[in-house]
């Protein structure tokens, strides 16, 4: 049986469409309000935090590597997250108790590639872009 057609079926079609929308993953995600509760950023695109420690995360099979990450405590709500430090040698620019700016890491809130459970990446360290430090365009501010 198909959908009802004809006169006086608008209410039924409208109600059916409203019920079926909840089976759409993107609609459900945007309308349930869970992004405010479960997302450490609270719906924001970036967040500042304090580096607690440097950690190495082992890559998933079949790759073999230790991906350089940092544990960060967010300033806005105190939640602790693990953030990936991109590029070769950039972990050397980050020290404990530094203030870092953290952003999402692609894939709409899921882990990326072979790094298990890491959903964020470091963008800035001590208000200086990590890319600028890497390309030696800027230096870390003296503290």
UniProtKB/Swiss-Prot annotation:
GO biological process, one term: cytoplasmic translation
GO terms of molecular function: structural constituent of ribosome
Modification type Hydroxyproline: residues: 62
Keywords: Cytoplasm, Endoplasmic reticulum, Hydroxylation, Ribonucleoprotein, Ribosomal protein
Keyword hit for Repressor: no
InterPro entries membership: NA-bd_OB-fold (IPR012340), Ribosomal_uS12 (IPR006032), Ribosomal_uS12_euk/arc (IPR005680)
Residue ranges with Basic residues bias: 1-20
Cellular compartments annotated: Cytoplasm, Cytosol; Cytoplasm; Rough endoplasmic reticulum
Keyword Transmembrane: no
Region feature Disordered, mapped onto this chain: 1-28
Broad class of where this protein is predominantly found: cytoplasm
Annotated Gene Ontology cellular component terms: cytosolic small ribosomal subunit; rough endoplasmic reticulum
SUPFAM superfamilies in the record: Nucleic acid-binding proteins
Quaternary structure note: Component of the 40S small ribosomal subunit.
Protein family per UniProt: Belongs to the universal ribosomal protein uS12 family.
Protein name listed in UniProt: Small ribosomal subunit protein uS12
Organism listed in the record: Lumbricus rubellus (Humus earthworm)
Upper lineage: Eukaryota, Metazoa, Spiralia, Lophotrochozoa, Annelida
């Amino acid at each position: 049986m198909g959908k009802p057609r004809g006169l006086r079926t608008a209410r039924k079609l409208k109600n059916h469409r409203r019920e079926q929308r909840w089976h759409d993953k993107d609609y459900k995600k945007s309308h349930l309000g869970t992004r405010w509760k479960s997302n450490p950023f609270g719906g924001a695109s970036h967040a500042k935090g304090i580096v607690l420690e440097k950690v190495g995360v082992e890559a998933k099979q079949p790759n073999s590597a230790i991906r350089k990450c940092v544990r960060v405590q967010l300033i806005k709500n105190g939640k602790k997250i693990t953030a990936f430090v991109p590029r070769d040698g950039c972990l050397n620019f980050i020290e404990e108790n530094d203030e870092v700016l953290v952003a999402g890491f692609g894939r709409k809130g899921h882990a990326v590639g072979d790094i298990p459970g890491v959903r964020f990446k470091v963008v800035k360290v001590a208000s200086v872009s990590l890319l600028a430090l890497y390309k030696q365009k800027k230096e870390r501010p003296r503290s």
